[in-house]
A protein has these predicted regions:
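The catalytic "switch" region of P-loop NTPases
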Residues: 219-233, 237-342, 388-392, 401-403
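Walker A/P-loop-proximal flanking segment of P-loop NTPase domains
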Residues: 1-127
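Short acidic, S/G/P-rich loop/turn micro-motifs used as interaction or catalytic elements
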Residues: 107-108, 143-146, 237-244, 272-273, ...
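P-loop NTPase nucleotide-binding core
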Residues: 47-62, 91-234, 240-242, 299, ...
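Winged-helix-like regulatory helical subdomains adjacent to P-loop NTPase cores
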Residues: 30-34, 45-53, 345-348, 358-453
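Alpha-helix-centered segments that form part of catalytic cores
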Residues: 193-221, 325-354
Length: 631
């Protein structure tokens, strides 16, 4: 039960946190950017805690692929930019360069682009006053208004760049770009007019070209690319959810780049590239494929905290503690020490890594949100940190804040984490199908020989126990969309796809379904078909809201979690029992909720023990709270 929506210390470091943990660090200076950049990819292949193999998805190309986080490959990428950035490289038969950055959502494609431009190849673009200096235009499709067409947005962005550039907007350069047209007009239809009249008509002509945008941009860019290089960078295409729009951006970008002899750098999801890799538009380019593997999220967060600490050093401030006292801080960077010490190398840090599923952008957002709302006793934290030099903030508060995000109660539609207890199929018998299928695939992944499981196998086995193909398809699509599973080939999930579980899927099936905080959050958005159980949960929730005694309230919360868990176990049991009757392999017969019951009892016992230890005066009689020690 959340009684406080904001962390009392957040305002002291809010600006620095928002900047350092921003989804985009585009506006950081060169030094700060270099401090934030992580060049070490995630290499985990086996998670010992849940004893599951972490599968890897296949490459989208069989040929050579450069690794963006590999030192040798990075140098080769730099060499490519330098070669194409040389003066007067555009000979008649030369194809423009096309670089495709392929990676999963949040893998760091945008960060890699800015790192290359700001740090590794900055000298190529340093002298803007030189006509032969190459050009770099970064177009972010998150800035594209929905009513604007793709082509119009690209052309308007190029025009804005032209207007800002001291050389491209110069009247002499504009005249040179339109020289042939101007001379043709003068000697043709305007030959009878006076010089003043000719200049007036030519001005009208140029202004008309400018208003129409495309012909003006075509002339200016075509002229500059005769003598130097122009790199057009199309970014954040993968943030657009509609595949059709992604596909059109892909083809339109290639078309414009080919027409204007631009070097194209395009960020894409692998799935979008697969759909178009045989497109005729691609044949016009010399291809370089750069694979951006997700960096270690723990390293990313560590560097962001280091940047926050650097920016807050020697700043003073104060906040109102939970007891109403005003706490003054001579150096608010010690708050960063408390927070980072509670995240890095801790269970909280591991949870963020797992829940983000290699999505750095999501990991940064979750960290930012739980720091804003996740803690209720910062005064106590500061006091203990001053006395002992270390303090670990409560992990359950952080975990709840991560699950809830900006909301007060959990809803799958707003949370970054999906609900495994409700498949949303509108059939009570199929309510736990999402968790059942996930547990089966995670069980297979516990075998060292596991590589993948085919969708045809999943469909066949589920048919055996009475699950229709339509339900199977919907669940597989959901599990992939919710990041519990991945398709090996990056394509859409179908019966012909092969699947591997994500690390998040493994933790859901093997740990989180018996976690008290997780259960409490999930039950708020789970359908309860059994009227008796629903009535009990409703009554307990009402009593919890009105109860003021902390231990009584926690005891009732434990009882509510148990009732919910037992109801979910009853719903999944028929699927497991049918698999046993039909003689399916052991992976299909295991009941994850029954198997996790000992861990649930241990978890709830820990919660009750912690409540007594923290909130109950020693002289009180514990029996009056009716604590159920046998859970």
């Amino acid at each position: 039960n959340r009684t406080q929506t904001n962390n009392p210390i957040y305002h002291l470091i809010a600006d620095e946190l928002r900047l350092a943990f921003s989804d985009s660090i585009l506006y950081l200076d060169e030094d700060s950017f270099e401090k934030c950049y992580v060049s070490t990819p995630e290499t985990m292949r086996f998670d010992s805690k849940i004893r599951m193999n972490i599968g890897r998805r296949s490459n989208v190309l069989n040929g050579e692929v450069l690794k963006g986080l590999n030192d040798k490959d990075t140098q080769r990428i730099i060499d490519k930019f330098q070669v194409k950035g040389k003066k007067k490289i555009h000979i008649k038969d030369s194809k423009p360069l096309a670089i495709l950055l392929l990676g999963t959502v949040g893998a760091g494609k945008t960060t890699f682009l800015h790192y290359m431009r700001k740090v590794r190849i900055k000298e190529i673009f340093s002298n803007k006053e030189d006509k032969l200096t190459p050009h770099w235009l970064h177009i972010d499709f998150l800035d594209n208004p929905s009513e604007s067409s793709i082509v119009d947005f690209i052309y308007k962005s190029i025009l804005e760049y032209i207007n800002r550039h001291p050389i491209l907007s110069n009247q002499t350069f504009v005249f040179d770009a339109f020289r042939e047209d101007i001379e043709a007009i003068k000697s043709g239809p305007l030959f009878l007019l006076s010089e003043e009249q000719k200049n007036s008509r030519i001005s009208d002509f140029l202004y008309e070209q400018y208003k129409n945008i495309r012909p003006y941009v075509d002339k200016i860019i075509s002229h500059i690319t005769k003598t130097t290089s122009f790199f057009l960078v199309i970014d954040n295409v993968d943030q657009i959810e509609l595949d059709d729009i992604q596909s059109r951006i892909f083809t339109e970008s290639f078309s414009i780049s080919r027409a204007l002899s631009l070097n194209l750098v395009l960020s894409l999801r692998q799935s979008t590239f697969i759909k178009h890799k045989n497109s005729p538009a691609i044949d016009a380019f010399d291809f370089e494929i750069i694979q951006i593997d997700p960096p270690r999220i723990s390293s990313v967060i560590a560097k962001r905290f280091a940047l926050v600490k650097y920016m807050t050093s020697n700043k003073s401030g104060n906040f109102i503690a939970e007891n109403g006292a005003k706490v003054a801080l001579d150096d608010i960077s010690q708050l960063v020490d408390i927070i980072s010490g509670s995240v890095l190398g801790s269970e909280i840090g591991t949870r963020i890594e797992v829940l983000a599923t290699d999505d750095v952008r999501l990991a940064l957002r979750m960290t930012r949100e739980f720091l804003e709302r996740g803690y209720t006793s910062p005064g106590k934290a500061v006091q203990i940190f001053r006395e002992q030099g270390r303090y670990l903030l409560p992990r359950h508060e952080a975990f709840r804040a991560i699950l809830l995000g900006t909301e007060l109660t959990y809803s799958e539609s707003t949370s970054t984490i999906a609900n495994p207890f409700d498949s949303n199929l509108a059939v009570t018998q199929m309510q736990l199908l999402r968790l059942y299928v996930l547990n089966v695939i995670v069980s297979y992944a516990s075998d060292p020989a596991f590589r993948q499981i085919d969708g045809s196998v999943i469909t066949e086995k589920l048919r055996t126990i009475g699950v229709g193909d339509s339900f199977t398809h919907r669940v597989l699509v959901d599990l992939c969309n919710k990041r519990f599973l991945f398709t090996v080939n990056h394509g859409e999930p179908t019966a012909s796809s092969s699947f591997i579980p994500s690390r998040l899927g493994g933790y859901i099936a093997k740990e989180l379904i018996s976690n008290f905080t997780f259960i409490e959050c999930m039950l708020y958005d789970t359908y309860i078909a059994d009227a008796k159980t629903w009535g009990k949960l409703r009554d307990l929730s009402g009593k919890i809201e009105s109860e003021r005694d902390v231990i009584k309230r926690i005891t009732m919360r434990v009882s509510r979690a148990k009732s919910f868990y037992y109801q979910m176990e009853k719903l999944i049991s028929p699927l497991c029992s049918e698999a046993i009757i039909r003689g399916l392999p052991s992976q299909w017969c295991s009941n994850p909720l029954r198997e996790r019951l000992p861990e649930l009892r241990k978890e709830l016992g820990r919660v009750l023990h912690s409540a007594k230890k923290t909130y109950q005066p020693k002289q009180d009689d514990t029996s009056k709270y009716f604590l159920d020690e046998s859970v």
